[in-house]
């Protein structure tokens, strides 16, 4: 049997759940994957791309058949449309990370709106789909940002600090030593060390019984409804 729920069509049976977007988006949120209700879930998220290192990240994700969520900068997406298209065509979720990585809380409403809208337009131009998720620059927001963004705001509960360390083993250890079911991991696809760290993180956590999912998948399977203007750092 099926339920029509907030732009999703969800097909259920007794033990597994599969989900696809309706034809409005023509986008399969789960690609050749079924998840048991008892699985431990984790969501990798990547900020500040795309750039030339994003391809390395996508290569590793493909190697392990992992889907993730990319919060892209409009300014970089505009200059790297082929990489953005590859993200989307690979089944990744694409979110909005503003256009110029401004600290939105320091700016007037018209600037905030422009930063978000321009990025959404670039994403739509490349993918044919407007983003459904917002991650403000630096993860900083206020009530004005929440209102103007008009999307669920996704932050994180594990920061790999990959922007600081640029060391794949150290990046991996920050995830492996802290991870819990329902975690959202912050990474940056613009660094080669981040791509390399995935070769440590993914097989280790898969061996521990974790399944890697996109943000919409994570919250769906945790039975949490993502609401516009609300802020989420994990799914538990």
Regions found by a protein language model. Give the residues of each.
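Terminal accessory/targeting
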Residues: 1-43, 59-68, 181-236
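Active-site beta->alpha N-cap acidic-glycine motif
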Residues: 9-107, 111-122, 130, 220
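Catalytic domains of cell-wall/extracellular-matrix polysaccharide-remodeling enzymes
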Residues: 56, 78-79, 89, 102-233
